[in-house]
């Protein structure tokens, strides 16, 4: 029985789709003005694992993750670069897809772009105006009347009267209430714009997601996800817009993943601790980064540090060392392990608990390796199958364990030395065998002798 923590109710609930076996999930994606940072990677990986598990459980999932391709940040960055905004966004979208592929992230079923849904935004804004939830003061802007929506604050547990304390209307704004937010922004010189019933302009951020989600998934759908930094005001405003426009409940369950901290501090450019995914992947294998991001529960914060990355690498080394050198086999039943893995994942996608089951399997594989090779191989196959549901342990063990050797050691030289050592051992020339091992150790190479022969990896 799958249970999900719903931010809307602040409780863990038994998950029941709105319609039969169909699950419709929308996740807020990237604003494509720069390369993806680790926080984006956290959200990408979290909802990738959720996608994999929902499909494994047999649900007919439609996964939609949007792209925000028009926004203040995009316009500012394009102007800084001296390039059209759409040239910038195309380049950043391509880079995002490269990062996702390296992190073994499945593609969403649909990836709508905001600029492809301008007409839908016009329609929803007009509906809100017609219903009295929005107003056009005549300066090209259109605003949402927060005070008109009785349920405002139900997601974030904020009270409108508290929000009004200290709020003020900025110069140049034509708001009726300081809490009102923009649905359509009147055009400014030098900025991209589209024609609309209220004049040239562009959409506000919040209306983009309301329109893209309902266009792709319908007025009501099962799951809405994103980082917990989006809970307010973005997701709160989405609810206000969508439910006022359609008269129906918007998303049934709201899932929010935790943030990334860097050595215990919030990641930010001003603190100089801001890392893009590609910067991290220059130093660490993509699977190490992915494992770091799944080793904690998706709602928990993750502290990014060199030490934690080394621990993630060590964990994967243990897994791949358990898998290596074993013959192909059908997965063992391993009913107890399978049940506990499923119980962890059914408990609000508890990947930390699931990973602990993988460690137990790896220990059992190692225990059986010398006494019952077929049983060890079958259990290793089950370990790999379960790990695949988390998107890890799908490489050839030697490929992972030797990854990063390029530019550090000559693989051909290592193989030649290993062969020379084998010949020395066969001739019982133990001194020569030890000399070669010492030479390889000095090169940073770790040898591991087993029934299947000698394998090697780089020292941590």
Swiss-Prot record:
EC numbers: 6.1.1.16
Key words, A-Z: Aminoacyl-tRNA synthetase, ATP-binding, Cytoplasm, Ligase, Metal-binding, Nucleotide-binding, Protein biosynthesis, Zinc
Annotated catalysed reactions: tRNA(Cys) + L-cysteine + ATP = L-cysteinyl-tRNA(Cys) + AMP + diphosphate
Top-level EC class: ligase
Positions of short motif 'HIGH' region: 30-40
Cofactor dependency: Zn(2+)
Localization per Swiss-Prot or TrEMBL: Cytoplasm
Example GO molecular function: zinc ion binding
One GO term (biological process): cysteinyl-tRNA aminoacylation
InterPro entries: Cys-tRNA-ligase, Cys-tRNA-synt_Ia_DALR, Cys-tRNA/MSH_ligase, CysS_C, Rossmann-like_a/b/a_fold, tRNA-synt_1_cat_dom, tRNAsynth_Ia_anticodon-bd
Residue numbers covered by motif 'KMSKS' region: 266-270
Cellular component aspect of the GO annotation: cytosol
UniProt binding sites for Zn(2+): 28, 209, 234, 238
Binding site for ATP: 269
Cofactor, how bound (note): Binds 1 zinc ion per subunit.
Family assignment from sequence similarity: Belongs to the class-I aminoacyl-tRNA synthetase family.
Subunit: Monomer.
NCBIfam families assigned to the protein according to its UniProt record, in alphabetical order: cysS
Protein name, entry field: Cysteine--tRNA ligase
